[in-house]
From Swiss-Prot:
Arthrodial membrane. Residues 1-21 are annotated as: Disordered. PANTHER family: CUTICLE PROTEIN (PTHR10380), CUTICULAR PROTEIN 65AU, ISOFORM A-RELATED (PTHR10380:SF237). The keyword Ligase does not apply. InterPro entries: CHIT_BIND_RR_consensus (IPR031311), Cuticle_Struct_Prot (IPR050468), Insect_cuticle (IPR000618). GO terms for molecular function: structural constituent of chitin-based larval cuticle. This is Cuticle protein AMP2. PROSITE patterns: CHIT_BIND_RR_1, CHIT_BIND_RR_2. Keywords: Cuticle. GO terms for cellular component: chitin-based extracellular matrix. Residues 16-81 form the Chitin-binding type R&R domain. It comes from Homarus americanus (American lobster).
């Protein structure tokens, strides 16, 4: 949309890995993100974005990106079937071990 105007463009960078920005246009496009240094040397991000679809509905995605990767959340994303009980139990065991500091190299 060539006629879209910028409504918000705010940026803050602390210079130490902490930052925040927010951007919005008159045609319904919006994004915001904050970043912090991660405990394992990575950058951690948390944010969201939205934009209008051709049918007039709004697509919206929020996300976290950290040492566990990019984790989006949206009603637009497909959802797989639930994990079988035995797989769920294995995931719980793995999470317990991770919390205890157990690693397998």
């Amino acid at each position: 949309d060539r006629d879209a105007q910028t409504l918000t463009d705010e940026r803050s960078d602390q210079g130490d890995g902490n930052f925040r920005y927010e951007f919005e246009t008159s045609n319904g496009i919006y994004t915001q993100k904050t970043g912090t240094p991660g405990s394992e040397g990575q950058s951690n991000y948390q944010g969201s974005f939205r934009f209008p679809l051709e049918d007039g509905t709004i697509a919206e995605v929020s996300y976290i990106a950290d040492e566990y990767g990019f984790q989006p959340s949206s009603d637009l994303l497909p959802v797989g079937p639930p994990a079988p009980p035995h797989v769920q139990r294995l995931l719980e065991i793995a999470e317990d071990q991770r919390r205890q500091g157990i690693t397998f190299d």
